[in-house]
Amino acid sequence: MNDLVISCENLNKVYQDGSNQVAVLKGVDLALQQGEMLAIVGSSGSGKSTLLHILGTLDTATSGSAKIKNQEVAKLSRTEQAAFRNKNLGFIYQFHHLLMEFSAVENVAMPLLIKGLSAKAAKVAALEMLEKVGLAHRSSHKPSALSGGERQRVAIARALVTKPALVLADEPTGNLDKQNAIKIYDLINELNKSLNTSFVVVTHDLELADKLGKIAYLDDGKLTIKESQHVA
């Protein structure tokens, strides 16, 4: 049996709004095996991004347990959380957040340089990952010379170059047209199969969500999980 990459039990998140308390997550239970994929869908303000931030150690739950790779992340210090993120997690956002003054390969190599790899080793690994996302031939181009879909592929390569166990993606195709969005989801499926990386993807698009293995519906702070009808 595969190891659990995510294990959440009775996760609750409450925000204070003046004199009122707003419950965003209510008793969320979630388990994801290494190599599985999950789409999280729900209306605006349903708590999708909040849940993603808790999984990514960027926020903490009010109560309950959230374990990533069997580690209770809330119990780590901020320094330990940063090291944990760098080792185990990759992040993809709606906007690529690439550094515009650097080339594609330099952007992808950045997380490896932060981890302490030599410039040569980081570049080799970055080129290999750009090859996997079909952009090795554009490695020397800066983001301004790339299309929107290409920029997001570079962002995906950057998220995966450290070989994380889990990639968290917040509306990764929200800034793309439908055709390019489908290509990005197909790429995520391909990378999931070839690298055995788990993906949790927040999206508002049910059609795209159905391309992943499981769909989690967040409604009024409660999570319901269903198997996707799509076989990639």
Curated annotation (Swiss-Prot):
The keyword Iron-sulfur does not apply. It is a peripheral membrane protein. Keywords: ATP-binding, Cell inner membrane, Cell membrane, Membrane, Nucleotide-binding, Translocase, Transport. Disulfide bonds: none annotated. ATP binds at residues 42-49. GO terms for molecular function: ATP binding; ATP hydrolysis activity. The complex is composed of two ATP-binding proteins (LolD) and two transmembrane proteins (LolC and LolE). Belongs to the ABC transporter superfamily. Lipoprotein translocase (TC 3.A.1.125) family. This is Lipoprotein-releasing system ATP-binding protein LolD. It comes from Pseudoalteromonas translucida (strain TAC 125). The gene is lolD.
